[in-house]
C-alpha cells in the first residue's frame, strides 16, 4: 500500500492538491459507509494513523450555529470557531475526532511561508503528512470567496488570515488533516472552509510563522517544510 500524502503544494502550474493515488479496492470488498447524508466512507487501503471509528451520521446533520474547540499547544492556546452552516459534515467529523482524542499529542507537521501561501498544517498523528482517520468524506466547498488579486488567471481565491480549512488529496478525500491560515493566501477554492481561528490563536500562529521553516542540508532557507518551532497539540478540547 502506497500512502497518500495530503498536502497543498506549489507547482509551476499553480497551487494544486497532490497525493499518490489510492490503490484499487480488492474485488468483492466493500468499504463501510455511514447511511446518513455525510456518507463517511472507510478507507481500508489507507488505515487510520490512530484507531478511531466512523463518525455518527444522523439523518439530519446539525447545520445551524457554531461550535468551539481549543487546541492546547506548546506555543499557546489556539481557540477555533467551527461553522456548522458552512460545512456541517466537516464540523461533525472534526468534533468526532476531537472527542475521540485523535488530535491529542500530535504535531503540526508543515509550515508554508510562500508570499501567496501562508498556512500551518496539522491533524496527522503520524507526523508525516500521510496519515488520516481511516475514512474520507465529501467536500463542502466555499462559493463566496473574493478573487485573489495576485492571480492573473482568475482561478484562485483569497483564503483570508484566520481561515480554518481541510487539507485533502483530491476531490472528496477529506479526512483529519486541516490547515490554519496565518496570512492571506491565494488558492483554488478546492478546500473546505469549516471555521476560523480566534485572535488569541492567531497570535500563537504568528509566533510559529516568525520562526520560519526548519532548514535542511539541501535548503538552508526553505519556505515549505517542518516548522522551525516545533508545534505540538497537547490536547484538543470541545467547548
Model regions and ranges:
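Cyclophilin-like peptidyl-prolyl cis-trans isomerases
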Residues: 2-9, 14, 19-239
